[in-house]
C-alpha cells in the first residue's frame, strides 16, 4: 500500500478512536476539562496582556492610529470597525492570522501538550484527541490609542470568534493559546514600529 494509503487508514483509525473515546466521557466531564483549560489560559492571557499588551510611544495619537491601521492591513487582517475620534480599531481575520501556519504550529507545540495535560484528569485518553486546529475560528484584535504624557498609549487585546463548530467532540476553549498570543502581540508591535519608522515618526 502506498504511503498516502497508510496515512488515510491511520486518519480513519484516529477518527474512530476519537468517536469511541468521546463516548467514554460525559458532557459534564468535557465541560469540566474545558473549564479547567479556560481558567489556566485566562490567567496566562491576562498576565500576557499586562506584560505585552500596552506600549507608549512619543507620537501623536493620529499618527499612531494611522500606523495601526496600516499594521493590520500588512498582516492580512480586515478592519471591521474603527473610530478615529475615540482612537479605537477592531480587526479580524480567519485563524491563524496574524500568525502564519509555521507560527501557529510553533504555538501549538508549546500549548497543546499543556492543554492536554490540564484536560486529562477530566476526560482521560480523550485529551489526546484535542487539537489546535485553526479551522472554524476567527481572530479578533481590539486596539485603542489614548493620549499619554507627550505621546500616545496603544493597547491591544485579542479573542477568538467561532465561525463553525469544532470537528472534534470537545467544546471549544474561550481563550487563545498563550504562546500564540505572545507571538501575535510581538508580531503586531514589530509591524507597528516599522510603520512608524516608515512615516519617520520614530527613529
Feature locations, PLM:
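Ser/Thr-rich, low-complexity intrinsically disordered terminal regions
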Residues: 25-203
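Bacterial N-terminal signal peptides that target proteins for export
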Residues: 2-14
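C-terminal motif of bacterial Sec signal peptides marking the signal peptidase cleavage site
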Residues: 20-23
